[in-house]
Each structure stands twice: as C-alpha cells, then as structure tokens.
C-alpha cells in the first residue's frame, strides 16, 4: 500500500499546525482556544438541548446543517420489513448481548475495581467500549419502547461503571494496577484505545440521557474530559499532545458540544482532527490509524476501514458546526473515492483482512472480502452526516444500500449471532477463517473483539431517527416502511405522516400527511437511484418532475389527511462492475429495489457438487421472475433466472495448451436467489453475489 504523505511535508512547525484555522480565527482566537483546552476555568457544563427532542445526532442548533434531525422517539416503525428486525433486536439481541457481556467478564472488569468481583481483568484493551456501545443501543431502544426491566438493569450496570471513576475523572479498567503508568503514553495513544473508549462512553452516555434525562453516565464522562483530559492534554506548552489512535472521540466530542453547548468540546475535537506536530508518527501509522495529521490533507480513503469512516464522521460533524470549507472539500473528495473505487455493491467497505483495511482502487475481492459490519455502519453514519450538510439524495442512496444489505447481513434473522466480516462469496470447503472467526462459521454469538454485535444493535435501535429530516422549507422523507411520524415543522406547527407500504418487496408507498393546522410547506420525497420509472400523485392528481436519484419537491398548502401515492420501479437489474474490478469481470449481480441478491447452495435445484456454486452461469437477455415466499427465511422475495450448470471434465494437469479441447457439459437450470442479508441463516453453505454470465 503506497503512502501519499511525507511525514514532514505537512508539518512546518508545531505552532503552525497545532491549531486549526477555523478555530484560531475570528470566532475565538488562539489565546481563547489555549485557555479552553488547557483546562482553565470555564462556565459550568449544563443542559443545553431539550433531551427529548434530539435525533440520532442533534443538529437542531448546527448552523451549517441544511437538514435537522427528527427525534428517534418521534417515529414509530409499524408492522413491516424493519419492525421484525427491531423487535428481534429489542427482545433477543440486546438482552442476549447483556448476558454475553457478563459471561465474558466485561462487567467483572469494573466490579473488580470496587471489590465486587475477584475475577481477573479479561479481554483486549478496548473491552470497556463493549459496555458503552451496548449502553448506547439501550439508550436508543428506550427512546421508542418502554422497557422498565431493561432500564433498571442498565441503570444498575451504569452505577457500577461510574463507581470505578477516580477522583481525577479517569475511568478505564485496563490501565490500572501495574498498567497505570501506561496511561496516555505515546504507544498507548496510538494503539491503546483509551480515547476510543471514552468516545464510546460519551456516545452511550448521551443516548441514555436522551432516553429519560438520566445524567449518571453523562456526568461521569464529562468529569473524564474536564478533570483528566483537558487539564493535561492539548496544544498548550504545558500539555501533552493527543493522537486519537482509533478515531471515535472526535464525533463524540462534537455531540457533547451539541448536548451541553460548551464550545471547549468542539475545540478539542477540532484540535484532534487537525493533529499535533509534536507527536512523531511513522508513515504506516498515518495510513493505518487515519488520524494524527490535518484531516484536510487527506486525499483518499486508506488504512483501517472503521477508523477512516469514524474519522470522516467526526470531520463532517466538525464541518456542520464550523462551516470550514476545506473540510467539506476534503470530505467530498473522499466520498467520491468511496463511491467510485471502494464501495461494494452490498454497501460494505474494507477489502482486506490484513489491517481490516481499504485496498487499492477497484480492489474488491469477493470470497476474501472483509467488509466488517462496523465499517458499513460507520459508512452509513458518515453518509447521514453528509446528507444533513447537503440535502442531496445521493447520500441517502448509499445509506439505503448499506442498511438493507451490508449492515442487515451482519445480524442473523433470530438476532443471536453476528457477522464480523461480510464476504460476497463463500465456500465452506475452502479456508474461510480469519483471526476473529478461526472456525470459519461466519456467524457467531460472540467475538473477543466484539465491536460489531453492539454496533449492529445500536444501529437498528436508532433506525427510526433516519426516516425523516426537517428544514426551514418543510420535511424530507428519506426511507420507506410502515411508520408514523409525529413531529412538527420549524414554525412549531404539528405534523403527522403515516406511511403504508410493502417496501422493499413492492414499490407502492402511500403517505397520509396531516399538519395540525393547514399550512404551506414543501414535502421532499426521495426518488431512489435504482428506480428508473416513477409515479407520484397527491390526492389522485399526478405530480411531474420526479427524477431518479433526487428528492422531488412537492410544495403546496397541506391539510389533514392529504394523500401522497408513489410507485417505484421494482424491475430486477443485472449489474456489471467496472472492468477494473478484476474479480467481477464476466459476472453480474442481481438487484431488485434496494435489495441485492445472492445464490446460496440450499436453494439450487441441482445438488450435484453441492459444496460450491462455481459451475452456475446466468443467461443475460432473459427475464427474471420475482416471487415472495412467506415460509422462507422469515419471508423474503426470491428471484428465479434461467441459466446453465457447466460441468467440466477433470484435466490431469494444472496448466495445459489453450488449443487443447476440454470436454464440458452444460445442463439447463434455473438459478434461485435470495436476499444477501439472509444468507448463512441455515448453516454455512456456498454463496455468491457475483455470478458468471452468458449472453444469449
């Protein structure tokens, strides 16, 4: 992997690079920044937002957000595609992960510090973050569901967590006892995940606070930042420098700023995003960690995929608060790199197992695809922020691609097992193992690095908050499923939107729009990028102007029970990849609506050679049939497409002359495909997304 950065080409001096220009300008000045970040007395941190009104992220006061988030609690997902997943998440996944956390010693790590457990420390350096991500999932779940037992269980856990906090504010169960001298040292910052853990602590604390106003974990997290971090670390002459090591704290600090209104947290996020020249980093670290240098000097996505996605989230959050144009320029270039060179058709990212990293442009292997669940989630989170900054549907299309495919595949249908990686081809007879899944089972109930399971849980718990946004002009409708939104326009006028649909299996969507008082405003309807033909009607009258991959603006005076009817084109598309994607040459992928499909061995009529799917060929130019099977995999649409099975006679040598004929037999067959998200729910079996084709 080539490194485009020379470590000193972008560092002229510490004084020149320690303070981001957007911070050190008219808004505050260098002296004010150093005062804030040196731990000098500041106004007390207090409630800034109305905790009941915050969305997945709180953009209510973000000056450069074109769209404002709608609270998670303001949207109810009703019976339909996502309700099944969310019920499983609430009733099985979140409680099951609680039991896993206990049985694998994650809570014992806290309890041992207060004498409540004699168990030794267990797990890797980032084990604390597992508790915090699970707490964040609970926080989002409690925003839409009254679960007294879950609330009390979580509150008891949080009390035990907070009881371990030291007088300085420090709270981490790994860097204690004989490891205490390692706190925030150079090697610890780059690889020790201290700031990563506090970032997840902040996010979990904020989600719990927004669930019911409970500040227990939030106040503890603030004490960590105010009491331990700010007085000792930052750009000041008597402070030590900071490098995130694993980006995460940046977006958490911006969200803390949004929650409290205290700008010192925003400034600290900007300082970390900018990097500190006093901290020496090797070129390989700069690539892998995706931090430590000015974010605006980045030109491409590289290194650890989750780190880079989280860095982009933090940078976009910073832009939404500051409007720094250099950040937007960089983010736009990185997004182009993502969508043109690095994005799997399933919405997954991160091609390489080594380093869990991005590969070179167009390096998108299938069987060896890593596609970590956390990376797809981070990519979705980043696009959510880019959407808020721009109001452009191209970002929503990417969100939908990831959500329905590369994220949804990460959790089993029963909610009890998870994918760490999400390959696009699988052969159980081959070596499909990796360091997190040594037995190659693909889905497991637990990983010692268990970042993905609670990450998936928090994503599905927060899903209602992704359906809508508001602006000064009206309301944006991003995602489609049976749901009800009860919120208000920017002028305070109440608004209810009821969705009825069988999306994503069918393309018809009906909205009932009911403002509390008749009012003129714009309704922005997303026309998906995969839908070539679209119909939109309001109260039976056709509306023109619907363009694929854009928001259709319907501006009118709306009254109670106005009806919007949309019909999207659910034609099955056979997709080809750019020829530069070497593994996909001569192959096609099937997509219908937002769903990407795959072949899995149990569904094929021909069982000969059942260990793999290498002989199956799809016929281009023939029709695909779509059928809903209510009894298969909790109810899915299946595709049937004409094809053949090629059976080639064995050849004695590994290589042979091209002129030498090899006997091959072609057997007509019908290929059957299922949604990619549903694979590996019947045990490990051969699977492939990209299928060889023959033009007929």
PLM regions and their residue ranges:
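Secretory targeting signals
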Residues: 1-5
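Low-complexity, Ser/Thr/Pro/Gly-enriched N-terminal "stalk/linker" regions
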Residues: 36-130, 155-176
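Solvent-exposed loop and edge beta-strand segments that line ligand/cofactor-binding
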Residues: 113-131, 182-197, 230-246, 282-285, ...
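Active-site neighborhood of glycoside hydrolase catalytic domains
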Residues: 256-280, 300, 307-344, 376-378, ...
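Extended ligand-binding groove/face enriched in aromatic
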Residues: 114, 120-122, 126, 141-282
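Well-ordered alpha-helical scaffold segments within catalytic/enzyme domains
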Residues: 82-84, 135-148, 199-214, 249-261, ...
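C-terminal beta-rich recognition modules with glycine/proline-rich loops and embedded aromatic residues
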Residues: 43-52, 269, 331, 397-405, ...
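N-terminal export signals
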Residues: 9-35
């Amino acid at each position: 992997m080539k490194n485009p950065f020379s470590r000193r080409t972008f560092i002229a001096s510490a004084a020149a690079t320690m303070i981001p220009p957007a911070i050190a300008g008219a808004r505050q000045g260098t002296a004010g920044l150093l005062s804030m970040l040196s731990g000098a007395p500041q106004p007390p941190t207090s409630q800034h937002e109305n905790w009941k009104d915050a969305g997945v992220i709180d953009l209510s006061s973000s000056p450069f957000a074109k769209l404002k988030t709608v609270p998670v609690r303001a949207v109810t997902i009703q019976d339909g595609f996502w309700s099944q997943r969310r019920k499983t998440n609430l009733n099985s996944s979140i409680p099951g992960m609680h039991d896993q956390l206990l049985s694998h010693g994650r809570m014992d790590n806290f309890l041992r510090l207060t004498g409540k457990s004699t168990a030794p420390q267990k797990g890797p350096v980032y084990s604390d973050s597992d508790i915090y991500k699970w707490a964040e999932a609970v926080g989002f779940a409690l925003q839409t569901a009254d679960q007294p037992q879950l609330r009390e269980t979580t509150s008891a856990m949080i009390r035990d967590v907070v009881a371990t906090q030291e007088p300085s504010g420090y709270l981490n169960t790994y860097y204690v006892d004989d490891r205490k001298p390692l706190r925030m040292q150079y090697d610890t910052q780059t690889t020790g995940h201290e700031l990563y853990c506090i970032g997840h602590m902040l996010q979990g604390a904020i989600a719990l606070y927004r669930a019911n106003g409970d500040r227990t974990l939030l106040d503890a997290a603030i004490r960590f930042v105010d009491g331990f971090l700010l007085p000792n670390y930052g750009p000041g002459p008597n402070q030590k420098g900071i490098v995130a090591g694993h980006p995460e704290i940046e977006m958490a600090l911006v969200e803390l700023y949004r929650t409290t209104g205290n700008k010192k947290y925003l400034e600290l996020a900007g300082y970390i995003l900018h990097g500190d020249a006093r901290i020496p980093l090797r070129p390989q670290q700069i690539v892998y960690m995706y931090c430590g240098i000015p974010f605006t000097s980045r030109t491409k996505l590289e290194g650890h995929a989750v780190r880079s996605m989280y860095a982009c989230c933090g940078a976009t959050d910073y832009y939404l608060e500051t409007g720094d144009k250099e950040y937007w320029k960089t983010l736009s270039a990185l997004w182009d790199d993502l969508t043109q060179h690095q994005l799997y058709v399933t919405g997954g990212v991160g091609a390489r197992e080594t380093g869990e990293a991005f590969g070179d442009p167009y390096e998108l292997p299938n069987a060896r695809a890593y596609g970590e669940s956390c990376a797809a989630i981070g990519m979705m989170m980043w696009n959510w922020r880019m959407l808020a900054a721009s109001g452009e549907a191209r970002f929503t299309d990417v969100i939908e691609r990831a959500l329905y495919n590369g994220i949804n595949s990460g959790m089993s249908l029963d909610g009890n097992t998870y994918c760490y990686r999400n390959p696009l081809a699988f052969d159980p007879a081959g070596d499909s193992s990796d360091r997190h899944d040594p037995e190659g089972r693909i889905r497991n109930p637990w990983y010692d690095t268990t970042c993905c399971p609670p990450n998936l849980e928090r994503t599905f718990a927060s899903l209602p908050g992704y359906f809508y946004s508001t602006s000064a002009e009206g309301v944006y409708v991003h995602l489609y499923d049976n749901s009800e939104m009860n919120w208000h326009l920017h002028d305070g006028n109440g608004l209810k939107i009821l969705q009825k649909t069988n999306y994503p299996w069918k393309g018809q969507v009906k909205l009932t729009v009911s403002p509390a008082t008749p009012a003129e405003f714009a309704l922005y309807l997303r026309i998906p990028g995969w839908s070539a033909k679209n119909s939109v009607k309001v109260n039976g009258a056709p509306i023109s102007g619907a363009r694929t991959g854009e928001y259709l603006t319907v501006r009118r005076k709306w009254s109670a029970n106005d009806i919007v009817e949309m019909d999207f084109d659910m034609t099955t598309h056979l997709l080809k990849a750019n020829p530069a994607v070497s593994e996909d040459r001569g192959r096609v992928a099937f997509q219908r609506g937002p769903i990407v499909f795959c072949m899995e061995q149990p569904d094929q009529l021909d069982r000969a050679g059942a260990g793999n799917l290498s002989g199956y060929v799809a016929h281009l130019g023939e029709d695909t049939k779509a059928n809903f099977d209510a009894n298969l995999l909790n109810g899915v649409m299946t595709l049937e497409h004409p094809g053949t099975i090629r059976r080639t006679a064995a050849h004695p040598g590994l290589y042979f002359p091209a002129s030498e004929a090899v006997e091959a037999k072609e057997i007509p067959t019908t290929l059957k495909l299922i949604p990619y998200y549903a694979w590996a729910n019947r045990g490990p079996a051969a699977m492939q997304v990209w299928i060889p084709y023959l033009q007929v």
